Amino acid sequence: MSGIVTYGSYIPRYRIKPDEIARVWGENPERIKNGIFILSKSVPAPDEDVATISVEAARNALKRKKINPKEIGAIYVGSESHPYAVKPTATIVGSAIGVDFSLFAADYEFACKAGTAGMQNVKAMVDAGMIKYGLAIGADTSQGAPGDALEYSASAGGSAFIIGKDDVIAEINSTLSVASDTPDFWRREGQPYPSHGERFTGEPAYFRHVVNAAKMMMERMETQPKDYDYVVFHQPNGKFPTRAAKLLGFEEKQYKDGLITPYIGNTYSGSMMTGLSSILDVSKPGDHILAVSFGSGAGSDAFDITVTDRIEEMDRNKAPTIKKMLEKIKWVDYAIYAKYKKKIVLGDGIE
């Protein structure tokens, strides 16, 4: 059966606390933290973007498993903050890791589930015999307008999964998707920051799609919440995924290892995939995982995954674990954050 052969993630070391953002805008920091359950968020350095994050995540995946890059037949990078409007991120990644000229490559967009859409496609291509290995990446340097609620959560990071049939560490038993035209979050071409429906992003968008996708997967697999060792959802904040887990009947011990948004914020396309990476860092053979992404607009991808004995053969410490990256922090204030995120409009010739 096809599944995850190796994985890697990258989280920028720069962080800012919601308290600092609240201080600048005259907001109550305790109200903000209690409302979204985010204690800090990652900030990309001036030389970090979706391309560099994707390359680092892919290289970390290759550190854990010595795969010949020329055997990777497809690369799909999901993001809503690709560095170029016209020039693919996927080819940059391919060149950086040394893939062959014969390559399926594309950039995907579906808000925060573009990366998991890539996972589904490379799995289908592997199953069809079109490629030996496929690389799916979800990464973002997400945007939030100054003073907007999104500024407290929009962060940066990403994860890469190489999918194949040989030496699989986590079998993807099944995957499915749900989608509907739900205008909960959007950004038109040329606009620097997205707009959102505030509370409308909850019940009719996130919870409708995530909860139903999870239920449909459990119905298909004839499973119940108690049959899973771990569950991970898309994490726009710290509260939505915990509420979704409880609505479905999961316990804290099942979702706590994959819940990383309270420490790094919402990495958008990297969110659920990085939570899954965190679970794979600590999982053992036989562990059963339910993973559900979400993308505004709106849709969810669900995965039923079983960890194999091969994971014990992998030296997971050959690349930074999520725990290690969470511990590697350099704090910045709002001025540095605004500078790094290019929120300050400079005069001509000033850098």
Curated annotation (Swiss-Prot):
CDD domains recorded: init_cond_enzymes (cd00827)
EC top class, as a word: transferase
Annotated pathway: Metabolic intermediate biosynthesis; (R)-mevalonate biosynthesis; (R)-mevalonate from acetyl-CoA: step 2/3
Pfam families xrefs: ACP_syn_III_C
Entry annotated with the keyword Transferase: yes
Substrates-to-products reaction catalysed: acetoacetyl-CoA + acetyl-CoA + H2O = (3S)-3-hydroxy-3-methylglutaryl-CoA + CoA + H(+)
The keyword Acyltransferase is assigned to this record: yes
Keywords per UniProt: Acyltransferase, Isoprene biosynthesis, Transferase
Positions annotated to bind CoA: R199, K239
EC number(s) on file: 2.3.3.10
Binding residues annotated for (3S)-3-hydroxy-3-methylglutaryl-CoA, in chain numbering: C112, S153, T201, H234, R243, N266, S296
Function according to Swiss-Prot or TrEMBL: Catalyzes the condensation of acetyl-CoA with acetoacetyl-CoA to form 3-hydroxy-3-methylglutaryl-CoA (HMG-CoA). Functions in the mevalonate (MVA) pathway leading to isopentenyl diphosphate (IPP), a key precursor for the biosynthesis of isoprenoid compounds that are building blocks of archaeal membrane lipids.
Protein name in UniProt: Hydroxymethylglutaryl-CoA synthase
The organism of origin for this protein: Thermoplasma volcanium (strain ATCC 51530 / DSM 4299 / JCM 9571 / NBRC 15438 / GSS1)
Organism taxonomic ancestry: Archaea, Methanobacteriati, Thermoplasmatota, Thermoplasmata, Thermoplasmatales
